[in-house]
Amino acid sequence: MLEEEAVEEIVQLPVSLFGRGSLFLLHASGDSMTGAGIDDGDLVLIRKQEEAQNGDIVVAFVEGEGNTLKRYRMYGQTVFLHPENPKYRDIPLKDCKIQGVAISVIKQL
């Protein structure tokens, strides 16, 4: 699950840009989402919520692995977390829990 101890800093974000709700920034790690324009070290702004729509990029807690950033995909009645890099495989949603939905990416220069 998301760890409160991992909080490094609290910042105020303008409601006019990001809306209301509980938000947090996550450092992207690895190359599984490069096809979506999210690179290792980028900051991803996440809205805390437990539900997602088909195509959303989500943070999910995967049993035995921890948190991961992937695209939420529905194929018929089956739901997967889909990496945006062909060298990785889909993760069945039954093995994980949605923590939030990505709403913005801040690139590191």
Show where each model-derived region lies.
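Short, positionally conserved secondary-structure boundary motifs
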Residues: M1-G35, E65-N67, M74-T78, R89-I91, ...
